[in-house]
Protein backbone atom coordinates (compact mmCIF):
# COMPACT_ATOMS: atom_id res chain seq x y z
CA UNK A 1 0.00 0.00 0.00
CA UNK A 2 1.34 3.40 -0.94
CA UNK A 3 -0.11 6.79 -0.14
CA UNK A 4 1.14 10.23 -0.99
CA UNK A 5 1.83 12.60 1.89
CA UNK A 6 -1.37 14.51 2.76
CA UNK A 7 -1.52 18.23 2.18
CA UNK A 8 -3.74 20.63 4.08
CA UNK A 9 -3.86 18.39 7.14
CA UNK A 10 -3.47 21.51 9.30
CA UNK A 11 -7.15 22.11 8.65
CA UNK A 12 -7.75 19.11 10.87
CA UNK A 13 -7.17 21.40 13.85
CA UNK A 14 -10.57 23.01 13.32
CA UNK A 15 -12.44 19.73 13.70
CA UNK A 16 -11.30 19.27 17.29
CA UNK A 17 -13.68 22.03 18.33
CA UNK A 18 -16.53 19.69 17.36
CA UNK A 19 -17.37 16.03 17.85
CA UNK A 20 -14.43 13.60 17.69
CA UNK A 21 -14.02 12.21 14.19
CA UNK A 22 -13.40 8.50 13.68
CA UNK A 23 -12.37 6.74 10.50
CA UNK A 24 -13.53 3.13 10.78
CA UNK A 25 -11.91 0.55 8.52
CA UNK A 26 -14.01 -2.60 8.51
CA UNK A 27 -14.61 -5.75 6.54
CA UNK A 28 -14.60 -9.52 6.90
CA UNK A 29 -11.65 -11.39 8.32
CA UNK A 30 -8.68 -11.68 5.92
CA UNK A 31 -9.91 -8.78 3.78
CA UNK A 32 -6.78 -6.67 4.37
CA UNK A 33 -8.00 -4.20 7.01
CA UNK A 34 -4.80 -4.17 9.06
CA UNK A 35 -2.38 -3.14 6.33
CA UNK A 36 -4.75 -0.44 5.07
CA UNK A 37 -5.47 1.14 8.45
CA UNK A 38 -1.78 1.13 9.40
CA UNK A 39 -0.82 2.98 6.22
CA UNK A 40 -3.66 5.48 6.63
CA UNK A 41 -2.85 6.14 10.28
CA UNK A 42 0.83 6.51 9.46
CA UNK A 43 0.10 8.89 6.62
CA UNK A 44 -2.26 11.08 8.65
CA UNK A 45 -0.15 10.89 11.83
CA UNK A 46 -2.99 9.14 13.61
CA UNK A 47 -3.44 6.27 16.04
CA UNK A 48 -5.48 3.08 15.85
CA UNK A 49 -8.13 1.60 18.14
CA UNK A 50 -8.65 -2.13 17.68
CA UNK A 51 -12.32 -3.16 17.70
CA UNK A 52 -11.57 -6.88 17.88
CA UNK A 53 -13.08 -8.98 20.65
CA UNK A 54 -10.12 -11.38 20.91
CA UNK A 55 -7.08 -9.18 20.26
CA UNK A 56 -7.68 -7.71 23.74
CA UNK A 57 -6.17 -10.90 25.24
CA UNK A 58 -2.48 -11.23 26.00
CA UNK A 59 -1.02 -14.49 24.73
CA UNK A 60 -3.61 -14.99 21.99
CA UNK A 61 -1.41 -13.60 19.27
CA UNK A 62 -0.99 -15.88 16.27
CA UNK A 63 -4.59 -17.01 15.94
CA UNK A 64 -6.01 -13.50 16.28
CA UNK A 65 -3.85 -12.02 13.51
CA UNK A 66 -2.72 -9.18 15.72
CA UNK A 67 -0.79 -6.38 14.02
CA UNK A 68 2.88 -7.29 13.86
CA UNK A 69 5.42 -5.81 16.24
CA UNK A 70 6.71 -3.73 13.34
CA UNK A 71 3.27 -2.34 12.57
CA UNK A 72 2.69 -1.50 16.22
CA UNK A 73 6.03 0.29 16.38
CA UNK A 74 5.15 2.36 13.33
CA UNK A 75 1.71 3.37 14.61
CA UNK A 76 0.40 3.36 18.21
CA UNK A 77 -2.40 0.82 18.72
CA UNK A 78 -4.95 0.79 21.54
CA UNK A 79 -7.07 -1.97 23.16
CA UNK A 80 -4.69 -4.76 22.21
CA UNK A 81 -3.15 -6.97 24.93
CA UNK A 82 -5.09 -5.33 27.77
CA UNK A 83 -6.45 -8.48 29.48
CA UNK A 84 -5.33 -11.94 30.56
CA UNK A 85 -7.14 -14.85 28.87
CA UNK A 86 -9.20 -15.63 31.99
CA UNK A 87 -10.72 -12.14 32.20
CA UNK A 88 -14.17 -11.34 30.81
CA UNK A 89 -14.69 -8.78 28.08
CA UNK A 90 -17.84 -7.44 26.44
CA UNK A 91 -19.15 -4.88 23.99
CA UNK A 92 -20.04 -2.64 26.94
CA UNK A 93 -16.47 -2.74 28.29
CA UNK A 94 -15.10 -2.10 24.82
CA UNK A 95 -17.35 0.95 24.49
CA UNK A 96 -16.14 2.32 27.82
CA UNK A 97 -12.47 1.71 27.05
CA UNK A 98 -12.78 3.09 23.51
CA UNK A 99 -14.55 6.22 24.76
CA UNK A 100 -11.64 6.88 27.12
CA UNK A 101 -9.05 6.48 24.36
CA UNK A 102 -11.04 8.62 21.93
CA UNK A 103 -11.41 11.41 24.49
CA UNK A 104 -7.67 11.36 25.21
CA UNK A 105 -6.65 11.38 21.54
CA UNK A 106 -9.20 14.05 20.68
CA UNK A 107 -7.77 16.39 23.32
CA UNK A 108 -4.33 15.86 21.79
CA UNK A 109 -5.71 16.58 18.30
CA UNK A 110 -4.60 13.17 17.01
CA UNK A 111 -6.59 11.70 14.08
CA UNK A 112 -8.35 8.53 15.21
CA UNK A 113 -8.71 5.32 13.19
CA UNK A 114 -10.71 2.27 14.26
CA UNK A 115 -10.00 -1.18 12.83
CA UNK A 116 -12.17 -4.17 13.39
CA UNK A 117 -14.47 -6.90 12.30
CA UNK A 118 -16.53 -7.34 15.49
CA UNK A 119 -19.78 -5.81 14.28
CA UNK A 120 -21.40 -5.48 17.69
CA UNK A 121 -18.41 -3.51 19.00
CA UNK A 122 -18.59 -1.09 16.09
CA UNK A 123 -22.34 -0.71 16.45
CA UNK A 124 -22.03 -0.05 20.18
CA UNK A 125 -19.36 2.56 19.57
CA UNK A 126 -21.60 4.37 17.11
CA UNK A 127 -25.07 4.05 18.66
CA UNK A 128 -24.51 2.77 22.18
CA UNK A 129 -25.75 -0.44 23.78
CA UNK A 130 -28.93 -1.30 25.63
CA UNK A 131 -28.75 -1.54 29.41
CA UNK A 132 -29.74 -5.04 30.43
CA UNK A 133 -29.37 -6.61 33.87
CA UNK A 134 -25.89 -7.23 35.25
CA UNK A 135 -24.54 -10.76 34.87
CA UNK A 136 -25.02 -13.44 37.51
CA UNK A 137 -21.91 -15.62 37.82
CA UNK A 138 -23.72 -18.47 39.58
CA UNK A 139 -26.51 -18.56 37.00
CA UNK A 140 -24.02 -18.52 34.14
CA UNK A 141 -21.98 -21.31 35.71
CA UNK A 142 -25.06 -23.50 36.00
CA UNK A 143 -25.97 -22.91 32.35
CA UNK A 144 -22.41 -23.64 31.20
CA UNK A 145 -22.55 -26.88 33.18
CA UNK A 146 -25.84 -27.72 31.53
CA UNK A 147 -24.37 -27.01 28.09
CA UNK A 148 -21.47 -29.36 28.82
CA UNK A 149 -23.70 -32.16 30.10
CA UNK A 150 -26.54 -32.09 27.54
CA UNK A 151 -25.17 -29.81 24.82
CA UNK A 152 -25.81 -26.23 23.76
CA UNK A 153 -28.70 -27.42 21.59
CA UNK A 154 -30.82 -27.83 24.71
CA UNK A 155 -30.13 -24.22 25.71
CA UNK A 156 -30.83 -23.00 22.20
CA UNK A 157 -34.20 -24.75 22.14
CA UNK A 158 -35.09 -23.01 25.40
CA UNK A 159 -34.09 -19.67 23.89
CA UNK A 160 -36.25 -20.38 20.84
CA UNK A 161 -39.18 -20.90 23.20
CA UNK A 162 -38.52 -17.87 25.44
CA UNK A 163 -37.23 -15.38 22.86
CA UNK A 164 -37.64 -16.59 19.26
CA UNK A 165 -36.68 -13.15 17.92
CA UNK A 166 -33.27 -13.28 19.61
CA UNK A 167 -32.81 -16.95 18.67
CA UNK A 168 -33.13 -16.02 14.99
CA UNK A 169 -30.14 -13.70 15.34
CA UNK A 170 -27.91 -16.03 17.36
CA UNK A 171 -26.05 -19.01 15.90
CA UNK A 172 -27.19 -22.31 17.49
CA UNK A 173 -23.59 -23.04 18.57
CA UNK A 174 -22.81 -19.56 19.95
CA UNK A 175 -23.10 -20.73 23.54
CA UNK A 176 -21.93 -17.44 25.05
CA UNK A 177 -24.61 -15.31 23.40
CA UNK A 178 -27.25 -17.98 24.02
CA UNK A 179 -26.44 -17.99 27.72
CA UNK A 180 -26.44 -14.19 27.91
CA UNK A 181 -29.88 -14.07 26.26
CA UNK A 182 -31.24 -16.70 28.68
CA UNK A 183 -29.61 -14.86 31.58
CA UNK A 184 -31.45 -11.65 30.66
CA UNK A 185 -34.75 -13.54 30.37
CA UNK A 186 -34.26 -15.08 33.80
CA UNK A 187 -33.03 -12.00 35.66
CA UNK A 188 -35.21 -9.34 34.03
CA UNK A 189 -38.31 -11.37 33.30
CA UNK A 190 -38.24 -9.96 29.78
CA UNK A 191 -36.51 -11.22 26.63
CA UNK A 192 -33.29 -9.62 25.50
CA UNK A 193 -34.97 -8.67 22.21
CA UNK A 194 -37.33 -6.43 24.24
CA UNK A 195 -34.39 -4.42 25.58
CA UNK A 196 -32.80 -4.25 22.14
CA UNK A 197 -36.00 -2.85 20.60
CA UNK A 198 -36.50 -0.45 23.50
CA UNK A 199 -32.97 0.88 23.12
CA UNK A 200 -33.59 1.96 19.55
CA UNK A 201 -31.15 4.49 18.14
CA UNK A 202 -29.66 7.68 19.49
CA UNK A 203 -27.41 10.28 18.03
CA UNK A 204 -23.81 9.19 17.91
CA UNK A 205 -21.35 11.16 20.07
CA UNK A 206 -18.89 10.90 17.17
CA UNK A 207 -18.68 11.79 13.52
CA UNK A 208 -17.83 8.53 11.82
CA UNK A 209 -16.60 7.69 8.34
CA UNK A 210 -17.02 3.98 7.65
CA UNK A 211 -14.90 2.41 4.94
CA UNK A 212 -15.52 -1.21 4.07
CA UNK A 213 -13.18 -3.52 2.17
CA UNK A 214 -14.58 -6.26 -0.01
CA UNK A 215 -13.16 -9.12 -2.06
CA UNK A 216 -14.78 -11.62 -4.35
CA UNK A 217 -15.86 -14.66 -2.36
CA UNK A 218 -13.45 -17.09 -4.02
CA UNK A 219 -10.52 -14.75 -3.44
CA UNK A 220 -11.53 -14.13 0.19
CA UNK A 221 -11.80 -17.86 0.84
CA UNK A 222 -8.37 -18.45 -0.70
CA UNK A 223 -6.92 -15.78 1.57
CA UNK A 224 -8.60 -17.35 4.58
CA UNK A 225 -7.16 -20.78 3.83
CA UNK A 226 -3.71 -19.35 3.15
CA UNK A 227 -3.79 -17.35 6.38
CA UNK A 228 -4.78 -20.38 8.45
CA UNK A 229 -1.84 -22.31 7.00
CA UNK A 230 0.50 -19.41 7.73
CA UNK A 231 -0.75 -19.15 11.32
CA UNK A 232 0.01 -22.82 11.86
CA UNK A 233 3.51 -22.31 10.46
CA UNK A 234 3.94 -19.39 12.87
CA UNK A 235 3.24 -21.65 15.85
CA UNK A 236 -0.48 -21.44 16.55
CA UNK A 237 -0.64 -24.95 17.99
CA UNK A 238 2.35 -24.23 20.22
CA UNK A 239 0.71 -20.98 21.35
CA UNK A 240 -2.41 -22.83 22.51
CA UNK A 241 -0.28 -25.52 24.14
CA UNK A 242 1.57 -22.81 26.06
CA UNK A 243 -1.68 -21.23 27.25
CA UNK A 244 -2.98 -24.57 28.51
CA UNK A 245 0.38 -25.28 30.13
CA UNK A 246 0.12 -22.01 32.03
CA UNK A 247 -3.11 -23.22 33.57
CA UNK A 248 -5.71 -21.47 31.45
CA UNK A 249 -8.86 -23.57 31.23
CA UNK A 250 -10.03 -24.77 27.81
CA UNK A 251 -13.52 -23.71 28.93
CA UNK A 252 -12.63 -20.01 29.02
CA UNK A 253 -14.47 -17.74 26.61
CA UNK A 254 -11.15 -16.68 25.09
CA UNK A 255 -10.21 -20.30 24.45
CA UNK A 256 -13.47 -20.80 22.57
CA UNK A 257 -12.50 -18.10 20.10
CA UNK A 258 -12.40 -18.87 16.40
CA UNK A 259 -9.88 -21.65 15.77
CA UNK A 260 -8.63 -21.93 19.34
CA UNK A 261 -11.31 -24.38 20.41
CA UNK A 262 -10.42 -26.73 17.54
CA UNK A 263 -6.74 -26.68 18.45
CA UNK A 264 -7.71 -27.41 22.06
CA UNK A 265 -9.72 -30.39 20.80
CA UNK A 266 -6.68 -31.56 18.84
CA UNK A 267 -4.34 -31.21 21.82
CA UNK A 268 -6.77 -33.12 24.03
CA UNK A 269 -6.77 -36.01 21.56
CA UNK A 270 -10.37 -35.57 20.45
CA UNK A 271 -9.51 -34.88 16.79
CA UNK A 272 -6.45 -35.08 14.58
CA UNK A 273 -4.56 -32.04 13.37
CA UNK A 274 -5.81 -32.37 9.79
CA UNK A 275 -9.40 -32.43 11.01
CA UNK A 276 -8.75 -29.41 13.25
CA UNK A 277 -7.32 -27.45 10.32
CA UNK A 278 -10.31 -28.31 8.14
CA UNK A 279 -12.71 -27.16 10.87
CA UNK A 280 -10.81 -23.91 11.41
CA UNK A 281 -10.95 -23.10 7.70
CA UNK A 282 -14.64 -24.00 7.52
CA UNK A 283 -15.59 -21.95 10.57
CA UNK A 284 -13.50 -18.98 9.43
CA UNK A 285 -15.31 -18.98 6.08
CA UNK A 286 -18.63 -19.10 7.92
CA UNK A 287 -17.54 -16.29 10.22
CA UNK A 288 -16.56 -14.12 7.24
CA UNK A 289 -19.96 -14.78 5.69
CA UNK A 290 -21.72 -13.68 8.90
CA UNK A 291 -19.58 -10.54 9.04
CA UNK A 292 -20.50 -9.66 5.47
CA UNK A 293 -24.19 -10.21 6.23
CA UNK A 294 -23.94 -7.95 9.29
CA UNK A 295 -22.10 -5.16 7.48
CA UNK A 296 -24.45 -5.23 4.49
CA UNK A 297 -27.26 -3.97 6.71
CA UNK A 298 -25.39 -0.71 7.38
CA UNK A 299 -26.11 1.89 4.66
CA UNK A 300 -23.43 4.24 6.06
CA UNK A 301 -20.53 2.07 4.87
CA UNK A 302 -18.58 3.20 1.80
CA UNK A 303 -17.37 0.02 0.09
CA UNK A 304 -14.11 -0.27 -1.83
CA UNK A 305 -12.26 -3.16 -3.48
CA UNK A 306 -9.48 -4.41 -1.22
CA UNK A 307 -6.74 -3.82 -3.76
CA UNK A 308 -4.63 -0.94 -4.98
CA UNK A 309 -7.38 0.30 -7.31
CA UNK A 310 -9.28 1.84 -4.40
CA UNK A 311 -6.41 3.27 -2.37
CA UNK A 312 -6.26 6.75 -3.90
CA UNK A 313 -10.01 7.22 -3.59
CA UNK A 314 -9.98 6.05 0.03
CA UNK A 315 -7.20 8.49 0.87
CA UNK A 316 -9.09 11.36 -0.78
CA UNK A 317 -12.28 10.56 1.14
CA UNK A 318 -10.41 10.38 4.45
CA UNK A 319 -8.70 13.69 3.72
CA UNK A 320 -12.02 15.34 2.89
CA UNK A 321 -13.61 13.90 6.04
CA UNK A 322 -10.90 15.25 8.32
CA UNK A 323 -10.82 18.66 6.64
CA UNK A 324 -14.58 19.15 6.56
CA UNK A 325 -15.89 21.03 9.59
What positions do the PLM features span?
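Phosphate/pyrophosphate-binding catalytic cores of soluble transferases and nucleic-acid-acting enzymes
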Residues: 3, 13-325
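Intrinsically disordered, low-complexity proline-rich regions
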Residues: 4-8
Amino acid sequence: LFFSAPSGISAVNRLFMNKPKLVVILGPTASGKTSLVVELALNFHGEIISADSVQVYRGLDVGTAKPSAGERRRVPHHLIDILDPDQEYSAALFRRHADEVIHRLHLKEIPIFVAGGTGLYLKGLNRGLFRGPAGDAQLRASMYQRAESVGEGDLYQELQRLDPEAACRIHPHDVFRIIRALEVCTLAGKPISHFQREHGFRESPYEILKIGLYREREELYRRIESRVEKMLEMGWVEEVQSLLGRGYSPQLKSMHSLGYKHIVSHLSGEIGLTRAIDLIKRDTRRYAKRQITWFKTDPEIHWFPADQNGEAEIEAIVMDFFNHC
